[in-house]
Amino acid sequence: MSGNGGAATTAEENGSMMRVIRVGTRKSQLARIQTDTVVAMLKTLYPGIQFEIIAMSTTGDKILDTALSKIGEKSLFTKELENALEKNEVDLVVHSLKDVPTILPPGFTIGAICKRENPCDAVVFHPKFIGKTLETLPEKSAVGTSSLRRVAQLQRKFPHLEFKSIRGNLNTRLRKLDEQLEFSAIILAVAGLQRMGWQNRVGQILHPEECMYAVGQGALAVEVRAKDQDILDLVGVLHDPETLLRCIAERAFLRHLEGGCSVPVAVHTVMKDGQLYLTGGVWSLDGSDSMQETMQATIQVPVQQEDGPEDDPQLVGITARNIPRGAQLAAENLGISLASLLLNKGAKNILDVARQLNDVR
């Protein structure tokens, strides 16, 4: 049984009782692939445990006619999964980290952040525009994305293009692109395309100097009940130290800015030679006003260690007792410091105006 009498049960296999751990996921194909990836890692580590996957729809999956930034909820893709966790219907849930708010509801924590894949965005072109780039698309070409972050950065660089909202899962968006004439291209996360096996559709990768990425993009997170020590220990070994530290810095930056999907905020992190570099930016909705800065902190990528004290508080919703606390705090401080620098330079005005304009659109 799990540490707090949770959903973990036992099942009989070959005459012996196997522990069963229930894993919650969204129903989309990409979410299932991501969950299967995490479960495969856990099965390798724990061959004596049976993992049962339970799929469910979330608010973000159900409301498909409205841009995410307009729906007005912060837990669009996590709330229903957290409800199942709270009711002990599942023991852990797998998310894209970029969907997980920087402040989690009481009683929950991110127990693992897996090794990050490419965090950048990619452009997928309509078949008749294959071989083009955003720069060489014809005047007034429509480019599909529902991300304020992408639009704010790209509208300024490519004023000849028209950016239009497009919702739905990856399959739906690609179908809209290929079968209708509305869009010349759409913008998606590289990691999602790779996980779906659609690398061949990537027509252009947008590097951070062209378009910085979302906080946590490209990383998978495992959310658990905060007091379920047994499950925390079980999943904690999946923490990738470098990814963890980069994402703590990114999430601390976003939290201190009080950002979310209703304002254009983007980041870029690099770990090199014992230094963690964090670049963060904020934009007005049309990209005409922006502010970016870079800061760095000395942080050696640690190896995993024996678990630290059990009463360690979470950092930006994350519990990682097997990663040295000092490194985590240094990453968090870096994010807070960069956000403070931007706020002191007037970033709050940019974000406030962006919020107000987004509310009235």
Swiss-Prot record:
Transmembrane segments: none annotated. GO terms for biological process: animal organ regeneration; astrocyte differentiation; cellular response to amine stimulus; cellular response to antibiotic; cellular response to arsenic-containing substance; cellular response to cytokine stimulus; cellular response to dexamethasone stimulus; cellular response to lead ion. GO terms for cellular component: axon; condensed chromosome; cytoplasm; cytosol; perinuclear region of cytoplasm. Optimum pH is 8.0-8.2. The modification N-acetylserine is found at residue 2. It is an enzyme of class 2 (transferase). Its cofactor is dipyrromethane. It holds the Pfam family Porphobil_deamC. It catalyses: 4 porphobilinogen + H2O = hydroxymethylbilane + 4 NH4(+). Keywords: Acetylation, Cytoplasm, Heme biosynthesis, Phosphoprotein, Porphyrin biosynthesis, Transferase. InterPro entries: HemC, Porphobilin_deaminase_cofac_BS, Porphobilin_deaminase_N, Porphobilinogen_deaminase_C, Porphobilinogen_deaminase_C_sf. Belongs to the HMBS family. This is Porphobilinogen deaminase. It comes from Rattus norvegicus (Rat).
